[in-house]
Amino acid sequence: MTSRTILPRLHNSAREYARKVALFSPNARYYLVFMVLNGAAFGIYRLLFNFYVLSLGYDEALLGRLLTTVSLVQLVAALPAGYFSDRIGRKPSLMLAALASVATLVGMVVWPTALGFYTMSVLMGLAQSLSAVTYGPFMMENSEEEERTYLFALSSGMGMIAQFMGNWLGGQLPATIAGWLGVSATGSTAYGVALVVVAVLASTALAPILLIRRQHKHGPQDGYLSPFAVARSQPRTLFRLIMPMWVTSLGAGLLMPFMNIFYRHTYGSSDATIGALFAVGSLFMAIGLIVAPPLADRYGKMALVIVTQALSIPFLFLLGFAP
């Protein structure tokens, strides 16, 4: 394949991508803006939260329990949150989840005790669960089949680009705040003020949600199918869909929340270095998400998923044995 054939194909793919993006509804565009602002805020949060807890004198055991609490609440609340989102609508659900997330960030700064962290972890889990179960139905209701794959991919890609910016900014933020306040860059004051900055940035994500126009709620009369009904009618299909995601999520849950602690304790990396590493990872994930739709159109969705998942395994082994 020569450049004479590659360039026209790239040009045609770019034109097709732009055509699909032009089909996005106003609500979908507002949600993309929300994804960028929220993704940047929580890119900073995910980088610095572990360091904030440890800087207060707590140990990794408490940190692990806090992260487990968030995940457990997300799991338990997922089904009720789905019903709740169906009942009150997508826009109120997104607004409530965003407000709860902001309240959680502020609460972690003003109530930095073990009880406070557990309470805020429960609230964060509820907020993230409600946001997660609302995301998919909202995107489905505000897109047509022609552009839907591109909307999902671009929203995820833009979210990862926002996390790239948040990771990079998060790496610089504690040292910058420490310079302004005359405190230690790895102390609780610098990390606490950084979380306040995250809360302010997350608050700006409320603006695009306010611009979203409410859609008609799809209830049981509109063909709603209970997840229990799906489990009863197609148990084998549901099992095949859930198991790969369950195994992948289990591995990610054991590894990813502690990557920043791993870099700090194993390699003595600074916040800026860790932020840069996280940012590079987010950037490449964003590129992969954005180019996924044309690749899926060309090679098939299932083949693309299998190949990309398989390629990640050797790199996980290399990470564990890196010098």
For every predicted segment, state its role.
Residues R65-G82, A279-A292:
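Central cavity-lining transmembrane alpha-helices of secondary-active solute carriers
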Residues A77-G89, P174, G288-K301:
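Helix-to-loop junctions at the C-terminal end of transmembrane segments
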Residues T2-S25, R213-P244:
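Juxtamembrane intracellular "pre-TM" segments in multi-pass secondary transporters
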Residues V109-M120, G320-P323:
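Helix-loop junctions at membrane interfaces in 12-TM secondary transporters
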Residues A199-H218:
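C-terminal membrane-cytosol helix-exit motif in multi-pass small-molecule transporters
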Residues V36, T104, L115-S131, W246-V247:
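Hydrophobic core of transmembrane alpha-helices in multi-pass small-molecule transporters
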Residues P92-G107, A303-L318:
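Structural signature of the two symmetry-related core transmembrane helices
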